Amino acid sequence: MVDSPSMKDHLLSKIHDRTAVIGVIGLGYVGLPLAMEFVHAGFRVIGYDVSQRVIDLLMAGQSHIQDIPSQVVQEAVTAGSFVATAVESRIGECDAISVAVPTPLSKTRDPDMAFVLAAADAIARQAHPGMCVVLESTTYPGTTRELLQPRLEAMGLTVGTDTFVAFSPERVDPGNSVYQTKNTPKVVGGITPACVEVASALYASCIDVVVPVSSPEAAELVKLLENTFRAVNIGLVNEIA
């Protein structure tokens, strides 16, 4: 008797065949370019955002960010490859979801996790077996394991077996015409080896270079280190100037 394919193998097959439906939560300067890369790779993409103004613009074929021409959005919408929505239930149609919501600083200079928590709760309400969820928002080490994983497990899902959770930091440099979403290396750290495998396959479908790391905490720290390195160097050059 032949064993039925696991949730992991089934999702990997759908990613390979481009039959997986991809969700992107947060359609700003990170999420929209990522959504368009998935479209260009041959996927159907559902973009979710809480701003009805953004939804209306995108569905009218108009881009609201510098790095994505309106023509690109118009072609994706016309072809039926991309839809933007503020209807939470449509998250449940997705096989894999990238979360690219803001993490601004609060008045006390602490990270404001409200957008991440809202996205995590929305996903948990719509989650189903076989779903992959990847957090991209810049945040502190431990966020994926402490905030995202428990919400999915509270819905009866087992991370690493029937749902796959990872962190892959957004590294977009808005306005940079040389390094954009597709050719900027993508770091991926998952809760389990199966999570890393699925999330890496997801991004490898549309990103030139994918770099798996040992854990979501390692991937979360990569972004903080990169931001710190950049800030220190900018400050140093400004002082010398």
Provide a role label for each language-model segment:
Residues V2-A241:
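Structural/interface elements that position substrates and couple domains in central-metabolism enzymes
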